[in-house]
């Protein structure tokens, strides 16, 4: 069977932590920021974890990650 390919778009956007959880950046932080409050923008700075319901889908995109 041939090697499975890593989805390069997902590999650039997602990181697998040591405990096996998947870290992602938050959406809504690239433009149209004038209408958002400073509190909203501050909370968007911090990364989030991919939900457990999406973990299997992410595992298919990143077959060689932990």
From Swiss-Prot:
GO terms for biological process: translation. GO terms for cellular component: cytosolic large ribosomal subunit. Disulfide bonds: none annotated. One of its GO terms (molecular function) is structural constituent of ribosome. Belongs to the bacterial ribosomal protein bL35 family. NCBIfam families: rpmI_bact. Keywords: Ribonucleoprotein, Ribosomal protein. InterPro entries: Ribosomal_bL35, Ribosomal_bL35-like, Ribosomal_bL35_sf. This is Large ribosomal subunit protein bL35. It holds the Pfam family Ribosomal_L35p.
């Amino acid at each position: 069977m041939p090697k499975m390919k890593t989805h390069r778009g997902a590999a650039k956007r997602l990181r697998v932590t040591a405990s096996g959880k998947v870290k992602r950046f938050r959406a809504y932080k690239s433009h149209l920021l004038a209408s958002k409050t400073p509190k909203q923008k501050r909370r968007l700075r911090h990364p989030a974890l991919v939900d457990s319901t999406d973990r299997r889908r992410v595992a298919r995109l990143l077959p060689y990650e932990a």
